[in-house]
Amino acid sequence: MKAVARNQQGNVLVMVLIVLVVGGLTLAPLLGLMGTGVLAGQVYENKTDELYAADAGVEDAIWKIENNVPDSYPYQYPEPLIVNDKNVSITISREDLDPTCGDQLRYQIISTATGEDGSNTTIDAHLSVSYMDLSALLDNAIVSDNTITLKGDTVVNGDVWLPDEEDLLVDSHVTINGTIKDEDDVSIVWPTAEQFSTYYMEDVEGTYDPGSFIDIKDLYPKTIGPWYREGSLGVDNTGDPDTLVLEDTIYVVGNLEFIQPGASHNYTINLNGQTIFVGGDFALASTSISIFGSGCIIAVGDINFQPNIVGDGDDFVLVMSVTGETFFHPSGDFTGCIVGDTHVQLQPGCTIDWISPEGKGLDVPLGIGDDDRLPPVTGLGIESWEIS
């Protein structure tokens, strides 16, 4: 074993003492900094939880604006939401309903998340919301999101719209007394089946389901609506000629067919300003069935429309296929608007007259208007988002 060299006996002790002194001087501040870091991390985590909770409140308010709009404003949630153990209070305000606003409204959402220690974070968000508006669509006699075919000696007294004018196919004897417009002239936002379904479901929720078949002969009084048919529906008349009057919305989830009754059992449908909404196909292919009165016939699928048109030309009827073809060949002059998503085909001898739908009492989404009932939301944009 090596012997200890002269003058080295006290060096180790001195070094140990120096380390202990320096460590004592630096350890306390270092531990203090570590404690401060832990505390700061806890504060940061709490503020982050508050921010997430306040953000969740804004998202919940947006859902309410889109799906369960309040009746009056400003609207304050009756009970705070509990998110991340924070109480979240939410207030929704809206600009006054003004017919000049078009299809948009502005909303303010104030969402405040408060912790147990009284600390809070607030998000102040301003939104612009667009609502379903068929006004531009109803300004035309014929509308298609794809192609239009006009045959024979068809006469159209009104404007025609489709995305590309080159997709308008007409025979040489067709007369169009109006303007042919496409996407370059006017932009039309095509509505979806879901938007229509949401809008008309409000009219019929919890109402009568007539079953898969009705005979007008057995109805007393001869009125229908509001009806909600969970499936398909066939309508016939085996009795004497009669008139069927719509009193409210008819909503059919499946297909709806007005069965050809024969001349001795003919009947008339008075639309009476109401709407027939069909989730599948719609068929009314018999001139033994007459139609009069303003109203709407809207089907998600195909439409076969060949009734006898009666009236004085002052009624406005919307016949619309949302995703399918519209085959149109009625007897008599038609007044209103014909719409098809993939194809609109008018047969020879049809005369279509467009008049203004204003004042006809149509139950269709027309933007915010001056009605308390708002149509489905079609767009939502965040104008500002402030955190405090």
What are the residue ranges of the model-derived segments?
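Beta-strand/loop motifs with alternating small/hydrophobic and polar/acidic residues, enriched
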Residues: 2-145, 149, 161, 358-363, ...
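Short, ordered "entry" segments at domain starts
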Residues: 99-234, 238, 257-263, 281-294, ...
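Exposed boundary/loop context
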Residues: 3, 17, 104, 171, ...
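Short, exposed beta-strand/loop patches in secreted or surface proteins that constitute
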Residues: 79-82, 243, 289
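Beta-strand repeat architectures
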Residues: 242-247, 265-271
